[in-house]
Each structure stands twice: as structure tokens, then as C-alpha cells.
């Protein structure tokens, strides 16, 4: 296959090889940096989404990739719906057979994969765009506006054909990336039951409940709601009057690993830090404030190029692990710290720098990355979310299905977990999000709860619930123990014929699990 490339006014071509590096000697500002490969479509095609929550599944040649198409501009602006994903980077024509993704993609026919992956994202995200009608794969280096210091990596591309195991093993070998040794963890997160409505009393209540079912060394994670404001990383004095060190000590006394949610690279409207330092906010290329989403009535990314801002972020992170004693930080909304690059650094380069910084700051404490472009987290995060948030229902309300690809959706979370499964143990430990067994405050059927728990147990390295186990019946406790045992399954293989499912080996015997067909249709 021929690979044709273009850098500004320069053009060239070469034979596609396993490793394709094109380096341009230049100090010229990047205006165009792309390549083309003529390529026949496959029966199934996968394009990795921009970040953790971006829907990432296999597509047929007849499918469409939905962005914010049809959403009124006023609604987009009011709720900053374009702040969560790649809507300021890529276009969404919403036509059959037109797809795009970041860092890697593949074309699958049966068991044979044609795989394309980036070997280095620091010079700019590698964006793969495909058009079935044109039979063309377009590869864009997301580096517009960058001024190189003498050379520019137009392309660092890996290509291979083979089975799933062969192509992903070969890619990570070529990358030279080894996942941080991260054992599977089981435990609890406060988010998907109490959400931000937590305080010392409710956390202690759930901690007591967890002692009835969790094992020593399991994770007990305090999620969003403990802080006085997002961006002001001190405990709310009314909710947690004894402070977060006391909370971590209580978790440790119960025999569990203590986890804490934090979003150190963002600040919400109304936070003290934004009132005192409005100049810390990241602006877009026009110099205008860019809202990264509508959580907490709106929030903004913080500029790590401002020394005082970076020091503030570093101190907030270190305080949580070294002063308060938390063993794991769930670092959320990481993408917001790198929504834009500049003439010296691409947005991907900035995202990688953020991940390198937090790895350095926390030392051997554990990082669970969330809301993060995935490849910058390879080999740096211990664990990473690889899908969107699950919901309390299966498909959510019809009007919510029209918003961004990063929306809360249980069925989308299942798809993400299935189709990003290959990253588990290679890039980091995959976190598929939580499962539920409870009967209250939930709309999922028993069948749907079983699907979530089974998929998470088989394909992930993080297996958390947000239930209060103190309310579990003996039957629910037995089911919890069953799913926990399922996390020990070996040789898990995807089945993709008339129905999606898995084969696996547990207790020396081969098993098969099939998901009902109507549950995984978009």
C-alpha cells in the first residue's frame, strides 16, 4: 500500500511498512500535516474515541457517527456540550461510512485485523478519518499552529495485520510501553448512589456496610462531594468537620485501601480559586474563555504554563496523598487541562506532560485516571476509565440520547468496555465503571444488572459497586461473591457472531456468556 503525505506545501509518498516515521526538517509553522492511504473497508471498523467517555465501538460501513448533529446551537452553548469531546477539533458530517478516531483504529474481517496505531502522540494527536465511499484513510497530525524547533514528526505510524492478540501485542512492543503493575481491585465508590450528597455520617454508614462484604485491602473510594468547591481542594467544613485525614484514617482502620476523587486541573464557576485567579483559566485560540462542560454549573481548565497555578495544582495533589494519607486518587476531568495547545506544544503534548507530572507527584501511590485521552495515560496511570459513566437506567431518556458521545449511558459503557478491552494489562488496568446489585434508587432490571456486573468482572481490572452493602440480603451477598470470583476468570475471549458474548476459563472449566441481542443495539 502507498502512503501519501503532505506537510504545508511539501508532498511525498512511500510504501506502507510496519513502522512509518516521517520527520520534516523545518522551523516553519505547521498549517497542514496529514497522510492518505487508499484502503478497502472491512465488515467491522473501530476508531478510538477522543477521551475516556467518548463512545468507542465497532461500526459497519452503513453506520453513522453522531456528534452534536441536530442539537440547537443555543443548547450547545448553554450547557457547553462541545466542551467534553473533540467537537472543537474534528468534524461530524453524520453520513454513513464516515468515521474518525484518535491514536489507533482497526479494520476487522472475522479474526483478521488491519491495525493502525500511533507510536508517539507528543508531536500531536494522530487522528484517523475514514470514508467508505472514497476507500480512503486520512491521517491527520493535530499540530496546527505549532512552530517546530528544527524538526517535526509528521507521522509516527505503526501498521500490522494479524489476530487481535498479535496486533495489540506487537503495537505495545513497538511503543516500548509496559503497564504499571496494577493488581485487580475490588471495592466501593460513593458516587452512583449518593452522588454529591455525602458527608462524614453517610460515608461512615457505607464504610460499616462494606465491612460486611469487602475483604481486607479492598478499595473504599470517597467520590465527588467532599470538597468545599471544585477547584478549592479543602474539605467542606460542614460535611467533613474532622477533615479528610481523619476520613482516610477511618478507612484504613476498617482494613481498606483509601481512595479519593479529585479533579486538580479544573475549577468550577464560583470557586474561590477562580475568584482570586481568573487569569489561570485556559483560553481558546481566539483568547476567549472556553467552558469544558456544564458540571457544577460550568467549569474551566487551569493553565499549567502559569508557575503559580501549577504549584497550586501540585500542592493539592500531594496534600491528598502525603498529608491526608489516601492510597489512590481518582483524577477526573483530566482532558480539561489540555483542551488547546500553542505554538510551542500541541494539546497532546500538554496532556502527556500532565500525566507525567501527576505520576511524578504521587510516587508509588495509585492513579485512577478518568476523563482522559487514553494514549497519553499509557504506562503512566495505574488504572484508567475506558468508558462513559453508567446510568441508573439502561438507555436513558430519549432526548438525552441526542447529546454528545460522552454522555452518561449504561449501554454505551458496555460497548466501550468491550471494544477497549485490549488495553487492559497492556496500557494500564481498565476501569469499566461500577456495577449494581441494589433494589432501591435504580431502574436497571435484574438482567441488565447481571450484564453490567459480568462484563465488568470479565474485562476490567477495577470492580467497584456504589451500593450500600449494609443493605444487602444474603442472596445479594452471594451474588457479590459470585461476581468477585468471576474476576479471576482466565483466557477471556470475545464471541462476535449473531450475539456478542465471551468464552472464559474459571475453576478449570470453560464457560460461555452471551448478551441478549436487544441489549446492545445503539
How should these model regions be labeled?
Residues 1-167:
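N-terminal accessory beta-strand-rich subdomains and adjacent acidic, glycine-rich linkers
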Residues 154, 221-222, 259-260, 330, ...:
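A structural signal for short, well-ordered beta-strand segments and their strand-loop junctions
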Residues 170-185, 367:
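Acidic/polar, glycine-enriched structural segments that form the non-catalytic walls/loops
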Residues 185-188, 192-318, 324-341:
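Aromatic-lined carbohydrate-binding/catalytic grooves of carbohydrate-active enzymes
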Residues 203, 209-214, 236, 247-258, ...:
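Carbohydrate-binding surfaces of carbohydrate-active enzymes
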Residues 244, 347-355:
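Amphipathic alpha-helical segments in well-structured domains
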Residues 274-307, 311, 356-471:
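Glycan-recognition surfaces
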Residues 341-350, 381-382:
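Short glycine/threonine-rich loop-to-helix capping motif typified by GTGT followed
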Amino acid at each position: 500500500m502507498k502512503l501519501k503525505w503532505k506537510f504545508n506545501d511539501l508532498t511525498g509518498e512511500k510504501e506502507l511498512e510496519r513502522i512509518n516515521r516521517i520527520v520534516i526538517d523545518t522551523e516553519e509553522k505547521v498549517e497542514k500535516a496529514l497522510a492518505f492511504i487508499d484502503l478497502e473497508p472491512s465488515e467491522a471498523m473501530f476508531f478510538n474515541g477522543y477521551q475516556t467517555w467518548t463512545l468507542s465501538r465497532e461500526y459497519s460501513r452503513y453506520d453513522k457517527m453522531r456528534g452534536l448533529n441536530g442539537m440547537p446551537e443555543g443548547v450547545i452553548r448553554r450547557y457547553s456540550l462541545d466542551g467534553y469531546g473533540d467537537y472543537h477539533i474534528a468534524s461530524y458530517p453524520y453520513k454513513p461510512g464516515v468515521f474518525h478516531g484518535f491514536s489507533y483504529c482497526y479494520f476487522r474481517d472475522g479474526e483478521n485485523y488491519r491495525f493502525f496505531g500511533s507510536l508517539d502522540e507528543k508531536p500531536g494527536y494522530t487522528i484517523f478519518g475514514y470514508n467508505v465511499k472514497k476507500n480512503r484513510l486520512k491521517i491527520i497530525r493535530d499540530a496546527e499552529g505549532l512552530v517546530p524547533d528544527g524538526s517535526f514528526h509528521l507521522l509516527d505510524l505503526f501498521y500490522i495485520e494479524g489476530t487481535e492478540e498479535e496486533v495489540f501485542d506487537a503495537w505495545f512492543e513497538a511503543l516500548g510501553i509496559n503497564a504499571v503493575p496494577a493488581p485487580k481491585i475490588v471495592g466501593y465508590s460513593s458516587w452512583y448512589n449518593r452522588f454529591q450528597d455525602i458527608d462524614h455520617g453517610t460515608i461512615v454508614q457505607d464504610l460499616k456496610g462494606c465491612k460486611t462484604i469487602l475483604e481486607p485491602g479492598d478499595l473504599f473510594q470517597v467520590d465527588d462531594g467532599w470538597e468545599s468547591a471544585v477547584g478549592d481542594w479543602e474539605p467542606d467544613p460542614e460535611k467533613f468537620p474532622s477533615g479528610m485525614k481523619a476520613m482516610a484514617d477511618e478507612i484504613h482502620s476498617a482494613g481498606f485501601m483509601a481512595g479519593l476523587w479529585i479533579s486538580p486541573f479544573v475549577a468550577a464557576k464560583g470557586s474561590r480559586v477562580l475568584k482570586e485567579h481568573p487569569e489561570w483559566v485556559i483560553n481558546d485560540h481566539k483568547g476567549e474563555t472556553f467552558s469544558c462542560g456544564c458540571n457544577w454549573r460550568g467549569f474551566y481548565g487551569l493553565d499549567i504554563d502559569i508557575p503559580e497555578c501549577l504549584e497550586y495544582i501540585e500542592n493539592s495533589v500531594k496534600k491528598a496523598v502525603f498529608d491526608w494519607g489516601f492510597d489512590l486518587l481518582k483524577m477526573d476531568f483530566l482532558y480539561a487541562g489540555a483542551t488547546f495547545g500553542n505554538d510551542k506544544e500541541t494539546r497532546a503534548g500538554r496532556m502527556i506532560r500532565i500525566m507525567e507530572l501527576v505520576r511524578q507527584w504521587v510516587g508509588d501511590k495509585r492513579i485512577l485516571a478518568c476523563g482522559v485521552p487514553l494514549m497519553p495515560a499509557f504506562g503512566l496511570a495505574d488504572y484508567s476509565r475506558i468508558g462513559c459513566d453508567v446510568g441508573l437506567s439502561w438507555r436513558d431518556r430519549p432526548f438525552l440520547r441526542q447529546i454528545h458521545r460522552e454522555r452518561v449511558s449504561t449501554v454505551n459503557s458496555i460497548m466501550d468496555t468491550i471494544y477497549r478491552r485490549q488495553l487492559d494489562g497492556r496500557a494500564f488496568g481498565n476501569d469499566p465503571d461500577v456495577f449494581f446489585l441494589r433494589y432501591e434508587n435504580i431502574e436497571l432490571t435484574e438482567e441488565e444488572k447481571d450484564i453490567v456486573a459480568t462484563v465488568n468482572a470479565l474485562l476490567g481490572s477495577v470492580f467497584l459497586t456504589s451500593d450500600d452493602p449494609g443493605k444487602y440480603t444474603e442472596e445479594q451477598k452471594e451474588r457479590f461473591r459470585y461476581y468477585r470470583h468471576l474476576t479471576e476468570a482466565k483466557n477471556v475471549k470475545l464471541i462476535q457472531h449473531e450475539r456478542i458474548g465471551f468464552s472464559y476459563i474459571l475453576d478449570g472449566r470453560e464457560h460461555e456468556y452471551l448478551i441478549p441481542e436487544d441489549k446492545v443495539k445503539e
